[in-house]
């Protein structure tokens, strides 16, 4: 207020706000405090821009297009839950929620801060946090914030273990002389402490980071709610199947009673026929002989029927096994599951998998082509109903051969197989769905 002048301060609009989480309430309080002091917030400042940051820290400077416009508000809860319930007859895992409702570029940036080893906080990271000015000013403001919030950090000198940090070695090469190297210190922090610090930021980019965690928290809650709904739906389906089975058993019981009554009637008629033949003077032995022949023929027919029923039971058992994980294909092509293996011009993870419905797979493929200049489709499979289970099988088999998996990304650099081996292995696992194995 003092910065802009009290005569320019007026109430433009009053709004009633509702918050669904403690984090949202804290963000609103911080924003009000910041507005009351300087009236210079992210809403009044067009400079609130995130860089398009890749997983590697050395790529943070390469792209500067806005990521803020790509961060969207989550759809209504009911819409997300309905979409998840209609997605598959098999229970989804939480990655489906993150893949469909989290901004993938921002997720790739946040994944850089995962792991266990300390990370060098250089000027690229500080600029991404929203700090301005030279490196010394950025570090001073950031360290002041860490001290205020009692967040652990460490400053390394050139005599300490700096070999583990390539970005520190690069900065040393840019220093003018040994004296500057001896006086310099480099800030490193553990990933957990960095995430705590990001939630305490009060910079132009802090809102985007905090909104990311708010969305993630909301999706975790939605996944828990989805799990409850899915279990209830399965119970209802099981109850309907049990009722149908009980009805079938009642019908079989009635049919058996009817057959027993018919057999009693047949025996009665046979007795009456025998008495009638005796009255007519017909030789009983002849009738008995003919009757035995008919009985033998009937028994042969019954044995054949038993053989046919046994074969039907075997076929039914194999059919039950074969359809256990094979749901019917959706009527609409855009709802059918696809599994794609891509090759990209990425040094660390040249191979990338997309596992989604056709409509979402096309969107994911377009995102990859936007991010990388050279994208080739090595494998495209229709993998209904569950591409997630298929991908788990692939990872279980190929990890034994040294293939490295990171979410949807794949590297065979240190493995025992070639690109052709990778494609053939995935096709072989896909073909196993046609094999029928008897359950023991």
Curated annotation (Swiss-Prot):
Keyword Coiled coil tagged: yes
Alphabetized Pfam families for the sequence: DUF3627, MSV199
Segments forming a coiled coil: 229-316
Record's keyword terms, sorted: Coiled coil
InterPro entries: DUF3627, MSV199_dom
Entry annotated with the keyword Coiled coil: yes
Protein family according to the UniProt entry: Belongs to the IIV-6 006L/238R/313L/468L family.
Protein name, UniProt field: Putative MSV199 domain-containing protein 238R
Gene source species: Invertebrate iridescent virus 6 (IIV-6)
Taxonomic lineage of the native organism: Viruses, Varidnaviria, Bamfordvirae, Nucleocytoviricota, Megaviricetes
